[in-house]
Amino acid sequence: MPACIDSIRECLEGAAPSIVATCDTDGTPNASYASQVQYVDGQHVALSFQFFNKTRQNILANPRATAVVIDPFTVARYVLDLAYLRTETAGPLFESMKAKLAGIASHTGMAGVFRLLGSDVYQVLEIESVPGKQRPALPPGRSLLAAVRRAAQRLSGCTDLAALLDEALASLAAEF
């Protein structure tokens, strides 16, 4: 299936851990759980880089990975073929992932243990659906979380109160 990750967006909200597999230069595989596989845009995801471990070593030596993500509502599973592009250590993506990781750590009693070192950005080359039993899909509807994110993005560019109010009203009209 071509790489259009908008159709599996629910899998990329952090509700279920993902599995990431890499290989070193001689082909030895490594698989580990990833705290986050986060949606970046229609062609890219970001994985949390928390430790300098075997997965990180493999990606730097061989920039291909495979991730298995799970839809938290239908339990559908998808395999993503990924190509590593870069690591971001500052900016909106990094801060968003850092905040989400802090929430995951706090919820699991691991506050202070997890520390985000970077957001590894990958291009999604291919998406493959994994056969198996699933729950029925939810009725189609708008993604309010995506609408909130778009509105927040628009509001973040405001430099004064008047612009903030104007943009808030425009966002409400456009998104909700």
In which residue ranges do the predicted regions lie?
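A generic local secondary-structure boundary/capping motif
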Residues: 8-9, 35, 56, 107-113
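Short, structured beta-strand-loop surface elements
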Residues: 54-101
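Solvent-exposed polar/charged
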Residues: 10-13, 61, 174
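Helix-loop-beta substructure at the N-terminus of cytosolic sensory domains
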Residues: 158-176
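Signal-transmission linkers at sensory-effector interfaces
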Residues: 133-162
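Short, basic/aromatic recognition patches
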Residues: 1-17
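Short beta-strand segments
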Residues: 13-49, 80, 171
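Short, low-complexity N-terminal regulatory "tails/caps" that precede and couple sensory modules
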Residues: 91, 103-143
